[in-house]
């Protein structure tokens, strides 16, 4: 039986936490709604690299990834979608960007309670933030590895 390739879309999402606050960005697209730093994984880029890049582009912040909150696979008719949602912290004290550019309109730190005052892209952020604050499991970054990499890090 012949098999055709399945178009697959890969996305990286960053949940960036500072104390009890989280980083959100106001998107230029999607009706200027608030969401998390996120975007497509580019050719020859890892999910982790994409999360770091998207956060820098959309929020103006350098981050350090702490772990993985979720790995999602959504099979759809004719295609598939993969998303990796990372937990991260800011790498330094740089404030989020406040001027619009081609990537986003602005970024800010918010609490879960602040979300009710913003036009959100969906309820996902509220659930994620509440879960993180409640102690949701954070999986090691090593869970997501390049194909063929040894599990114990030994040379082949």
Predicted regions mapped to residue ranges:
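Unchanged
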Residues: 41-64, 74-128, 151-155
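A short gly/proline-enriched turn/hairpin at secondary-structure junctions
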Residues: 35-38
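Conserved N-terminal beta-strand and adjoining loop/helix that marks the start
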Residues: 1-22, 40, 71
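Short connector loops/turns at beta-strand edges and beta->alpha or beta->beta junctions
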Residues: 21, 28-31
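Conserved S-adenosyl-L-methionine
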Residues: 66-70
């Amino acid at each position: 039986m012949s098999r055709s390739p399945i178009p697959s879309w890969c996305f990286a999402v960053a949940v960036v936490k500072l104390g009890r606050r989280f980083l959100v960005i106001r998107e230029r697209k999607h009706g200027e709604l608030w969401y998390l730093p996120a975007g497509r994984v580019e050719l020859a880029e890892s999910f982790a690299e994409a999360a770091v890049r998207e956060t820098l582009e959309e929020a103006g912040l350098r981050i350090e990834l702490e772990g993985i909150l979720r790995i999602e696979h959504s099979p759809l008719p004719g295609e598939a979608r993969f998303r990796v949602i990372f937990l991260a912290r800011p790498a330094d004290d740089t404030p989020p960007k406040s001027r619009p550019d081609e990537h986003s309109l602005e970024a800010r730190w918010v609490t879960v309670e602040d979300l009710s005052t913003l036009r959100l892209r969906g309820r996902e952020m509220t659930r994620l933030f509440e879960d993180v604050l409640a102690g949701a499991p954070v999986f090691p970054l090593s869970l997501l590895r390049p194909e063929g990499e040894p599990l114990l890090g030994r040379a082949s």
